């Protein structure tokens, strides 16, 4: 988790003093990516100047640049990379003229973004979440044990700061890369549809389904581990409440909770936005198919009329008897003439008319729990009420019962952050998820 100890003026003055600047045209960026790729194949992580020149030659050939000045241009590119702190140059008096080059952290960061981080891996994300879960559990256990300031710094603050926070940042970066990939997929689909939408339909479907699957896979993985991570963070937060000197731990835990909530929330929002775009593309394709179908028919009809004398044709048509609707749409339906009088047991009474009466009865019956200070299990209570009503009324009755119940009090288990178990409330598959109300 990024924290800046310097102020904005201090950072600006520091950047100006060190003359930081980055300029990477497409050919220089390609050269840097080539260097990073070749560097990754070496165990020592070092490259000679000759190897850098060879990498530059490959890039120059790909851009169809002249080979006559390859040495000068390669030397200029290498010096430019060193000046921008993308490469470090090491020289030795024993081997003068044979410098050794290593990628700087800045160079690794840029190339890592363009190369390694471009590939989404569910296994990688699962391993990251597994590591985070283990670190958080150990930190929560250490917080529960308690100890001196050194104990809190070493066993609680350090794992949260330098392991959990960094992995959260990595997951956040993965989400942001997925945002870019979504935009790239949208651009690809737009180009395909502009060229030849009939031939592009299958490609569009593939791009849409792959992106939807990746987003859903990412979100499912996050949600599966999210509850456990939040539970351990809450354990650490509870342990710090009795210590006035642990504000730094409490602040870090709060930042981690906010980061985790933001990651999971944006994952679901990203899926919802993509679903909307998916529907928009399919609607466009259906509209294009309908328009193209009508346009082709009209074009063929015009050609047939124009070439009739050269190529005569006969038109055969079928005229089926029309089905007439004898019902008068304007006729008003009168109960006394059409349906007659109904027995009292079958008289219809709108549910809205008895809603207030039913709510008052349920409120009076539920008040007994508050008077006796008895825990109220919503799952059991709702099931008992629904058994008294037909299936068509279950949704409305359940809503009234829940509305009246939550007015009585709250469930202390809600403050733990742990989800309640799903309980069946009727025989038709309906379920409710709620903790037992025990505080009125």
From Swiss-Prot:
Pfam families named in the record: KicB, MukF_C, MukF_M
Subunit organization: Interacts, and probably forms a ternary complex, with MukE and MukB via its C-terminal region. The complex formation is stimulated by calcium or magnesium. It is required for an interaction between MukE and MukB.
GO molecular function: calcium ion binding
Top-rank taxon: Bacteria
Lineage of producing organism: Bacteria, Pseudomonadati, Pseudomonadota, Gammaproteobacteria, Enterobacterales
Family designation: Belongs to the MukF family.
InterPro entries: Chromosome_partition_MukF, MukF_C, MukF_C_sf, MukF_M, MukF_M_sp, MukF_WHTH, WH-like_DNA-bd_sf, WH_DNA-bd_sf
Region named Leucine-zipper: 208-236
GO annotation (BP), single: chromosome condensation
The name this protein goes by in its record: Chromosome partition protein MukF
UniProt keyword terms in alphabetical order: Calcium, Cell cycle, Cell division, Chromosome partition, Cytoplasm, DNA condensation
Functional description taken from the UniProt entry: Involved in chromosome condensation, segregation and cell cycle progression. May participate in facilitating chromosome segregation by condensation DNA from both sides of a centrally located replisome during cell division. Not required for mini-F plasmid partitioning. Probably acts via its interaction with MukB and MukE. Overexpression results in anucleate cells. It has a calcium binding activity.
NCBIfam families named in the record: PRK05260.1
Gene Ontology annotations for the cellular component aspect, listed alphabetically: cytoplasm; nucleoid
Subcellular location: Cytoplasm, Nucleoid
Provenance organism: Salmonella typhi
